[in-house]
Structures are given as structure tokens and as C-alpha cells.
Amino acid sequence: MKKNERIRKNIEFRRVYRRGKSYSNSLLVLYVFKNNNNVDTSRVGISVSKKVGNSVVRSRVKRLISESYRLNCSNIKEKYDLVFVARNKSKDKTYKEIEGSVTNLLKRAGLYN
């Protein structure tokens, strides 16, 4: 993902958490906020708590989520801020299960074309 497609600052994460709508399943929680700024692309942030595991496990989960988003981002509506929060169950899952969870949440949010 390019730098302008990522949510990096704490204030941006908090805005999505407070004002956005949430969708969840057993592996992930998705927060969606309609971004009315002059940004033409959707931005994404990924959050994995220390409850999920050590740094190796957390990084693996982040990589799986970001890769599944990257491969499906061409099918996603633009001008949204998205934050994926990994749940504890996601640490043992395969790429296919994480990808299915990501696409399921995007479809439920109405962002998947």
C-alpha cells in the first residue's frame, strides 16, 4: 500500500473509531468512516492488540490483513477510511480464512463492488 493509502496518526484512528460504523465477525472488526476530504482513494489502518500475541504473531496477522486488502482494493469503493482490528482468534488462521473474513466485512459494509 502506498503511504497516502494508510491511516497512520492516532488522531485519524480515533476519528474513525468515534464517528465510524463498525462491522464484526469472529476474526476481525471493521470500522468504516466516510471521508469527505479531498482524498480520492480509500485509506486503511490495521490494529492488532498485544492480547493477540508477541510481535512475530502480531506482524504476521497485520501482513495477512494488508495483503488480503491489497488484492481486493480494486473492488472497494473510494473515499472511505477503514480500520481493521484483529481479534484474538485471528492468530491461528490461514491466509484464506483471513481473506474470507475481510471480504465478508467489506460486503456487509456495502463497500465491495
UniProtKB/Swiss-Prot annotation:
Any single biological process term in GO: tRNA 5'-leader removal
GO CC annotation terms, alphabetical: ribonuclease P complex
Pfam families recorded: Ribonuclease_P (PF00825)
Alphabetical keyword list: Endonuclease, Hydrolase, Nuclease, RNA-binding, tRNA processing
Domain of life of the organism encoding this protein: Bacteria
EC numbers, comma separated: 3.1.26.5
InterPro entries: Ribosomal_Su5_D2-typ_SF, Ribsml_uS5_D2-typ_fold_subgr, RNase_P
Role description: RNaseP catalyzes the removal of the 5'-leader sequence from pre-tRNA to produce the mature 5'-terminus. It can also cleave other RNA substrates such as 4.5S RNA. The protein component plays an auxiliary but essential role in vivo by binding to the 5'-leader sequence and broadening the substrate specificity of the ribozyme.
Family listed: Belongs to the RnpA family.
Subunit structure and binding partners: Consists of a catalytic RNA component (M1 or rnpB) and a protein subunit.
Protein name, per record: Ribonuclease P protein component
Organism field: Clostridium novyi (strain NT)
